[in-house]
From Swiss-Prot:
Transmembrane residue ranges: 15-34, 41-63, 86-108, 129-151, 155-174, 187-209, 224-246, 253-275, 280-302
Name of the gene this protein is made from: sqv-7
GO CC aspect terms: cytoplasm; Golgi apparatus; Golgi membrane
Source organism phylogeny: Eukaryota, Metazoa, Ecdysozoa, Nematoda, Chromadorea
Protein name: UDP-sugar transporter sqv-7
Compartments where located: Golgi apparatus membrane
Length: 329
C-alpha cells in the first residue's frame, strides 16, 4: 500500500500495539459486564462511554492539557459523517459483544477488513498490494468457514456484527480523511463525535426502555461493587479506545487500524473459548478460526515490513551529478 506521508516506524508500531492492547481489554471488560454480570443494556453502556469521553476531554481542555477548536457553526460541516458512524459503530459493537461468543465475534469482525480495503481504494485512492490482498483473503476465507459451522448462531447478533463491520470500515477511512485535513485534530474528532451524538443516544435509550432497565438493575442487589468497577472501567476504556483508534489511524492506514494486532486476535480468540463460557466447539469452525488468525499474522508482517522498507529509500535530487548517485549503507 502506498502513502504520501509516513510516520516513523516506532510511532506506527507503538500506536498499533497500544490500540491492540486496549481493544483486547475493552472486549473482555464489556463481555464480562454484559454476559457474566448480566448488565441489562448495552445501549446504556455506550452512553456511559460517550459521557466519559466528553467529560475527560472537557476538563483536559479546561486545564490546558489538550487543545482542540471550540464549538462553532463550522464544526458540524468539518466532522460529518463521523458522529453518526461512531454512534452506530459503538452500539452495534456492544450489541454484538453481548450476543456472540468471543471467538466468533473476533472472527466475524474481520469482514470489516475487506470493506475497509474497498473504501480506502474509492475514497482515499489507496491501492492494496498483492501480498496484502492474499492475507486479507485468508482472513475472510477463514471467517466464512467459521461462520458456516458456528453452532451458536444468533441471527440478531450476526446482524449487529455486519452493521458494526460497515461502520468500522467507514469510520476508519473517514477518520483518516479528517485527520489528514487537520481541521479538528485527534482530540477534536473524539470530543465532537461524542458530543453531537449524546442527545440522540439518550433518546434511543429512553425510547427502548433500556434506561429504566439499567436504572432498576443499578438500584438492585445485583449491582455489586464488582459490577460498578466493571461498568466504570468500561466507560474509561471507551475513551482510551477512541484515543488509541485515532492515534493508530493517524500514524498508519485505516486498513492497518482495522487489521491491527494478530496478538489481539490470538489472545481474544483462544482465551475467549474458555473465559466467556458461550463458545461451542466444532472442528470445522475451529479450523476456520485458525485460518483467519494466520491471515491476521501474515497481514501484520507484510504491512510493517513493506512500510519499513519503503521509508528507507528516498529519491536523490535530479540536479546532482551522476557520480554521486551511489548506494547508501
Amino acid at each position: 500500500m502506498t502513502s504520501t506521508v509516513q510516520s516513523p516506524l516506532y510511532s506506527r508500531v507503538f500506536s498499533a500495539v497500544f490500540y491492540g492492547v486496549i481493544s483486547v481489554l475493552i472486549v473482555f471488560v464489556n463481555k464480562i459486564l454484559l454476559t457474566n454480570y448480566k448488565f441489562p443494556s448495552f445501549l446504556f453502556v455506550g452512553v456511559g462511554q460517550m459521557m466519559a469521553t466528553i467529560l475527560i476531554l472537557f476538563f483536559a481542555k479546561m486545564f490546558r492539557i489538550v487543545q482542540f477548536p471550540s464549538l462553532d457553526s463550522s464544526i458540524p460541516r468539518k466532522i460529518m459523517p463521523l458522529p453518526l458512524l461512531y454512534f452506530f459503530n459503538l452500539i452495534s459493537g456492544l450489541g454484538g459483544t453481548q450476543m456472540i461468543n468471543l471467538p466468533m465475534f473476533t472472527v466475524l469482525r474481520r469482514f470489516s477488513i475487506l470493506m475497509t480495503m474497498i473504501l480506502e481504494f474509492y475514497i482515499l485512492n489507496v491501492k492494496a498490494s498483492k501480498a496484502v490482498k492474499i492475507s486479507v483473503g485468508l482472513m475472510i476465507g477463514g471467517s466464512f468457514i467459521a461462520a458456516i459451522y458456528d453452532l451458536s448462531f444468533d441471527a440478531l447478533g450476526y446482524t449487529m456484527i455486519f452493521i458494526n463491520n460497515i461502520c468500522t470500515a467507514a469510520l476508519g477511512v473517514y477518520t483518516k480523511q479528517k485527520l489528514d485535513a487537520k481541521d479538528l485534530g485527534k482530540y477534536g474528532l473524539m470530543f465532537y463525535n461524542c458530543l453531537f451524538m449524546l442527545l440522540p443516544a439518550l433518546c434511543v435509550v429512553q425510547y427502548t426502555g433500556d434506561l429504566d432497565r439499567a436504572y432498576s438493575f443499578m438500584l438492585s442487589d445485583s449491582m455489586t461493587s464488582s459490577v460498578w468497577t466493571c461498568f466504570l472501567l468500561s466507560c474509561i476504556c471507551g475513551f482510551v479506545l477512541n484515543y488509541s483508534l485515532v492515534l493508530c489511524t493517524h500514524h498508519n492506514s485505516a486498513l492497518t487500524t482495522t487489521c491491527v494486532g494478530p496478538i489481539k486476535n490470538l489472545f481474544v480468540t483462544y482465551v475467549g473459548m474458555f473465559s466467556s463460557g458461550d463458545y461451542v466447539f466444532q472442528w470445522a469452525n475451529f479450523t476456520g478460526i485458525n485460518v483467519s488468525v494466520f491471515g491476521s499474522i501474515l497481514y501484520t508482517y507484510v504491512t510493517f515490513r513493506s512500510k519499513s522498507t519503503t521509508i528507507s529509500y528516498k529519491p536523490l535530487p535530479m540536479t546532482m551529478p551522476i557520480d554521486v548517485h551511489k548506494p547508501r549503507n
